[in-house]
């Protein structure tokens, strides 16, 4: 019926956002139907390019690559099977880091409890093996954020972090990238509220970088409050020319019902 068609459409629309998962399913289907030559082309392209931040897709990709090369030569080696094992480790670490960040955030804001012993065990494991995993984008981004959330007065974690953020943020799915940016903006705002005005520049430069990536958008539009905050900080930093261009250039990025009021006010 019509509702089932709508469900399928919504599922497909969401699926379209995940190219790595699509590629893995195409490879799997090609191998099941014995069209291995085409499967091999995709496998070579995927395994020779930079790894995705989607650890589940990486895990399945390397499993399929191991299967493909083993069938091809009847000899093969363990390279891709070992890589699938590494991808599984990254999947575990990445998701644990994300969950612990959210648990710490809720603890800080809402005073909700978490299991301290589990947290200590996880941190001990991660720190003992950090040299093996710190180059992965999810670990290099979420671990410093977790350090801050665990100790909100600390600043050491932020040293060199912005460079990592700018380097890797495009590799994350849009909604996840927005969550990451929100953590960093909150950190900057807390420091600004403590009178640390050097963080105005940090907040502003992060906003400037994220704007063309649509990572400050609320669905399709920039909220009137984001628009106002960027303008306010730009003026405080005397970035008058950039701010004036932003006021006019992002007028159409505001929701239609808020557009004129926000524009005229600012």
Regions found by a protein language model. Name each.
Residues 1-266:
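Extended alpha-helical scaffold regions
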């Amino acid at each position: 019926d019509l509702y089932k068609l709508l469900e399928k459409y919504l599922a497909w629309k969401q699926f379209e956002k995940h190219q790595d998962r699509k590629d893995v399913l195409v490879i799997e289907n090609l191998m099941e139907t014995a069209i291995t030559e085409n499967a091999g082309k995709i496998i070579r392209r995927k395994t020779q390019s930079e790894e995705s931040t989607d650890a589940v897709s990486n895990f399945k990709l390397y499993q399929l690559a191991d299967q493909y090369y083993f069938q091809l030569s009847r000899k093969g080696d363990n390279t891709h099977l070992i890589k699938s094992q590494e991808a599984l480790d990254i999947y575990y670490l990445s998701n644990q880091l994300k969950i612990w960040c959210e648990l710490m955030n809720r603890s800080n804001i809402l005073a909700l409890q978490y299991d301290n012993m589990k947290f200590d065990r996880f941190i001990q494991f991660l720190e003992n093996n950090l040299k093996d995993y710190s180059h992965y984008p999810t670990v290099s981004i979420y671990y410093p954020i977790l350090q801050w959330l665990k100790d909100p007065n600390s600043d050491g974690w932020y040293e060199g972090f912005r460079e990592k953020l700018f380097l890797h943020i495009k590799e994350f799915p849009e909604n996840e990238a927005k969550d990451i940016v929100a953590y960093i903006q909150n950190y900057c705002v807390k420091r600004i509220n403590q009178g640390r005005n050097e963080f105005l520049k940090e907040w502003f430069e992060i906003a400037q970088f994220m704007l063309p990536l649509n990572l400050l958008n609320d669905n399709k539009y920039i909220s009137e409050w984001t628009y106002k905050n960027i303008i306010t900080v730009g003026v405080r930093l005397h970035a008058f020319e950039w701010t004036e261009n932003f006021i006019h250039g992002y007028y159409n990025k505001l929701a239609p019902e808020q557009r004129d009021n926000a524009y005229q006010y600012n």
